[in-house]
């Protein structure tokens, strides 16, 4: 079962700038939290994939795109670059074509074209696609009804929004225990690994969601 976390490349000191040291720190923390899978909204730094390979963390490698998809001309180039770069990382178990409507169906076939040996599964996060139900943020009752009465493997690629302490994580046990009784449950990816705000020096040492 996938015990996953969504992760953005972010640190309080460097913002969106990354480093191998940051990748190591994040991967070790994810492992310590008993998580075994990671998803991002774009292809990660290779040094993060290296850490996933070495620690036995599986990864969902995603073509960037949210709500609005790439056209075929641009998207085909990006799929080629991403898959050819990452295809030999054993941590990658799934390719993701965009996020929450940001998928171009014409690009789906290209993943297998560059992943000729394994032809790993392609998903559309937030959709019921390719025999995998990945719908996001179900309420408890609707989630139980949808998933436990369904007929496809289900694995929400985002659920339990807990960023900036919005409280989503508080109900994780209730969701997880209920879903885990269903043999079609493949796990899921909670949102999100950490709050995303840079360290600031203009608040007199006060810590809040903006610091």
Feature names for model-found ranges:
Residues 1-32, 50:
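N-terminal carbohydrate-binding accessory modules
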């Amino acid at each position: 079962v996938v015990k996953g976390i969504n992760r953005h490349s972010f640190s309080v000191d460097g913002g969106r700038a990354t480093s191998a040291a940051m990748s190591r720190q994040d991967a070790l923390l994810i492992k310590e939290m008993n998580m075994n899978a990671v998803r991002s909204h774009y292809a990660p730094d290779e040094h993060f994939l290296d850490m996933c390979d070495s620690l036995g963390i599986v990864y969902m490698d995603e073509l960037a795109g949210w709500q609005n998809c790439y056209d075929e001309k641009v998207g085909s180039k990006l799929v080629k670059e991403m898959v050819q770069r990452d295809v030999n990382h054993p941590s990658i178990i799934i390719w993701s074509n965009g996020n929450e409507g940001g998928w171009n169906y014409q690009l789906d076939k290209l993943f297998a074209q560059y992943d000729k040996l394994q032809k790993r599964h392609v998903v559309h996060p937030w959709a019921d696609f390719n025999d995998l139900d990945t719908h996001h943020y179900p309420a408890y009752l609707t989630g139980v009804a949808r998933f436990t009465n369904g007929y496809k493997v289900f694995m929400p690629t985002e659920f339990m929004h807990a960023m900036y302490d919005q409280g989503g994580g508080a109900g994780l046990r209730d969701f997880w225990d209920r879903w885990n009784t269903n043999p079609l449950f493949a796990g899921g990816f909670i949102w999100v690994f950490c709050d995303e705000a840079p360290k600031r020096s203009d608040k007199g040492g006060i810590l809040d969601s903006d610091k």
